[in-house]
Amino acid sequence: MPKLTCLFSLATLATFALPLAAQDASRINEIIVVGVQDSHTVATDDTLVAPADTAQMLRKMPGANLNKNGELTGIAQYRGMFGDRISVAVDGAQISGAGPNSMDAPLSYAPVALLESLTINRGIAPVSTAQETIGGYIQAKTYSGEFGGREAFEFTGRTYFGTQTVNEGVVASGFFAMTNRHHLIRGFVMNESASDLEFPDGVITPSEYERERFDLGYSFRRGEHTFAVDIARNNTGDAGTPALPMDILSIDSDLFRTRYRHTGTAGTLTAELFGSNNEHWMTNFHLRRPPQDNMMSPGRMRFRQTFATSENLGFNLKYEQYVNNGVWNYGLDGHFTNHDAVVTNPNIGPFFLTNFSDSQRDVLGAFVERSLVVGETMGLDAGIRYNRVTMNTGEVGSNLNPMNMPAGMPVTMNNLSSLLANGFNNADRSQVDNNFDWFARLSLEGSKGITWYVGAARKTRSPSYQERYLWSPMESTGGMADGKTYVGRVDLNPEVAHEIEVGFDWSGANFALYPRAFYKNVIDFIQGTPATSAVANNIAMMMSNMGMGAPDPLQFSNAEARFYGFDVEARYSLSDRLTLRAIANVVRGERKDINDYLYRVSPDNVILALDYASEDWLVSLESISYAAQDRISLTNLEQATEAYSVLNLSGLIEFAAGAELRLGVENLLNEAYFDHLAAYNRAYNPDIQTRSRMPGLGRNIYGRLVWYF
C-alpha cells in the first residue's frame, strides 16, 4: 500500500508541476555560477580501463577506493566509509542487490564495457543527489546514444573487444542505435569471462567469472519534452568471491527505468521511475573445494547453498526553477526494497535456515535546495531533506537437525536456533525512522585564480536490513568480509554525521590544484561489538567447531566514530604534449567510544602519472604507492599490511576514423604485495593460506579495441 500511495503521489505532483514548468520566464537571461570543482568524472572514452569491475575505477578518483571481495564484487569506499553508507546510482536508479553479502553490489550493474562515465561527488553531496548520502554519492552513466541531427534515420554504434593475461579474460560487446532528430532506438549486448587470477606466487582460486548483458531502449524528443524507457537483463554465472564464505552460482537480474523531462524557460522538470528483480544463487562447494570431514573427504553435512532475492521499486521527481540569482531545486523521491534469503543443503532436503524473510526497507524523501550568487564573487549552496524510513520483516525459522537425531550437536544447535528464532519472531520488528539532513557550501572567488571553499552538513542513515534483521550468527553482513559472524539488533538508532570540509581550487593556464580537508563526527555509528547473547555465542562456537564460521560473534550496535583526513587532485602541463597528474589520499577512521580504529579503512596512497599526448596517440606511465596500514581494528581482528608501489604503463592509438587500440601493462615489474582492502582468503587454496591476506595481482598485459561508427 505505501508503494501504491507513493506512485499515485508522483503522478499527482507531476500533473500539477507541468503547468508550473511551462510558465513564462522571459525575465531570466543568464545564470551566473560561482563554485568549485565539486565532482570528479572518469569517462571510459578518455581512460584506459583493464578490469571488468567498474568499482575498480574508483581507485583513480580523489578520496575513493574499493573493497574487493571478488573480480565482479567491488564495494565502493569513500573517505573511509563504504557499503550502504555510499549512495550509488546507475543511470539515476538505486539498486539494492539480492546478495546479503553484496556479491551484486550496485556498480556490478554497470559493466565497464557498457559504461560511459563514473562520477563521484567530492566531499559533501547536495541533498538533491540522493536520499542517504552520509558517506558520499556516486553516479554511473551507461551508454544510451544520442539523437541525430536530421529527419532521416542513421545507424550508429560502438563495439568493444578486450583481453588480458592475468586471468585470460575476454570481453566482447556491441552498442547499436537507429536515430534521427526525434527518435532513438538502441540495443546493447555483452559477454565476458575469465579464468582464475594470477599473482607472483601462484593462482587465486576461485576468482573466475562469467557475465552477460542485454539492453533495449527507446527515447523520444520533441520541443521541450524528452521521454526514455529502458529494460535490461544482467546475468552473472559462475564467479569466485574468495574473500567471502560462498561463491556466485548465478545472479539473474531484470531492470527497467523510464524518464520524462520537460525543459522550459522557467525551469526543468524531471520524473523517473525505476525497478529491478534480482535472483541470486551461491554455494560453498561448486567453485571452491567443498567442506571436508575428518577423513579429508567431502563433508556432505556442511554443504551449503543460499537462494536470495531482492525487489526494487523507486521514483525521483525533481523540479529545477531558474531565478534571477540562481536556482531552486524541489524534489520527492522513494526507494522500496524487499529481500528474502534461505540457506539449504543440497544433500539433505529437510535442512534449512531462513536468513531473511520478506525484509522490507522503504524510504520516502523530500528536499528543497537553493543555489545562489551573492554579488559577483560568492556562491552559496544549501538545502534540507526529510527521509521517512519504514522497515519490517517476516518470521524466521530453521531445521538444523534434518536427520532427526535423538541427541548430539545437531540437536543442541537446533534447539539453540529455535530459541533465537522464537525470540526474534515474538519481538516487534517494525521500525520507523524520521531523518533530517541539511548541507551548506560557500565558495568565494579570490585573486590569482583561487576559489576558496567551506562546507558543512548533517547527514543521516538508517540501518540496513542486515544490521537490523540478521537473527542468527552468520556472515551476511553486506560484504564486510572480516571472517566474523554477526547478529543484528532491531532497535538500532539511525546514524547521524556532522561534517565540515574546507579547501580551495587554484588553476591557471598550465596547472590545477584541488585540495580538500574534512572532519566527520558520527553519532550512533553502526559497528559490530561483542555479542552478549549466550545463545548466539554458543551456537557460533558450535558452528566454529564444525569448521563453519568463527567463534565470538559480533552484534551490530550503536557506537561513536570519527573520520578525518584530506585528498588532493592536481595536474601540471610541462609542455603542450606532456602533463604530470597526481592524486593523494589520507583518511583516518577511529572509534570514539573505545580506543580502537575502524575496520577496512584505505591506507594512505598517492598516484603519480606522466602523460604524453600526440594528435592520434597517447602514452601514460603511472606510479601507484600505498603506505603501510597498521591503524587496524582490534574488534574485527584486522591484520596489518605493508607498504608497496606498482608501475603501470598504458597507451592509445587512433589508427582509423573512430577506431582505437588501447594497450597497457598493470604491475609492470610483477611486484608481490597485499591489498589492504581485498580482505582475507576464505577458500582452500594451495598457494594462499586460509584466512590470510589476499595477495595483489601480478603483471597484467591487456588490450582493448574500440570502434565507433
Report the location of each language-model feature.
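N-terminal periplasmic accessory domains that precede
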Residues: 52-57, 74-77, 89, 105-110, ...
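Short acidic/polar hinge/loop motifs at secondary-structure boundaries
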Residues: 94-124
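Gram-negative outer-membrane beta-barrel transporters
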Residues: 373-380, 388-389, 512, 518-522, ...
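Outer membrane beta-barrel strand-and-loop segments of large Gram-negative receptors
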Residues: 215, 306-318, 359, 363-367, ...
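C-terminal beta-signal and adjacent terminal beta-strands/loops
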Residues: 460-461, 523, 528-530, 625-631, ...
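Periplasmic-side early beta-strands and strand-to-turn transitions of outer-membrane beta-barrels
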Residues: 139, 144-147, 153-154, 171-254, ...
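Extracytoplasmic beta-strand/coil segments of soluble accessory domains associated
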Residues: 55-97, 122
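Face-selective signature of the C-terminal outer-membrane beta-barrel domain
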Residues: 221-234, 253-422, 427-428, 435-447, ...
